[in-house]
Amino acid sequence: MEQQAVIDFFDNAAAGWDAQLVRNEAVIGQILDNAGIRPGVSVLDVACGTGVLIPDYLRRGAAQITAIDIAPEMARIAREKFPQENVTVLCGDASQAHFPALFDCIVIYNAFPHFPEPERLISHLAGLLAPGGTLTVAHGFSRKALGAQRLQRSAAGRGAGRAVCKASDRHSADLQR
């Protein structure tokens, strides 16, 4: 699906997104544990949609949450839902976005297959990690479906620092810098 088609699809789905959302709290908890979401961290939520994980980051005490989605309507809804000072919601392409600071944790949840150039995305996001930071790609599909091997190749190809990709469970793959 081309990028504009993805934007149009999610813009059209935004109004009813939260109503159709199915959450598995145990799986989400495990994903956020693997991602290192704990008090005081800075988080970048990539393809945040309507802010599905923002309440989880807040409950876990994240100091700063930056969320980005390419679909304007998704970003608008997330911005309205979370007006807190420590939450910033942006509309833009995460594979090209620039930020004033690095992040302790970057999470892509249920969105990785929608990126047309996943290697480029991972390479760009790896450069936004603070030392010791973790990039977590998580989806309801298996580790194999996530393309964890592709994630590993992209991370290793950056050549900046030590990149370790591990399949932490069947729901996510983590890149640690």
Language-model regions, residue ranges each:
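Conserved class I S-adenosyl-L-methionine
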Residues: 1-38, 52, 136-159
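Short glycine-centered segments of the SAM/dcSAM-binding site in methyltransferase folds
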Residues: 42, 133-134
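Class I SAM-dependent methyltransferase SAM/SAH-binding core
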Residues: 44, 50-96
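A conserved beta-strand element that flanks and buttresses the S-adenosyl-L-methionine
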Residues: 107
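Short catalytic micro-motifs in class I SAM-dependent methyltransferases
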Residues: 110-111
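A short glycine-rich, Lys/Arg-flanked "PGG" loop and its adjoining helix->strand segment in the class I
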Residues: 119-131
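Short alpha-helix
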Residues: 161-177
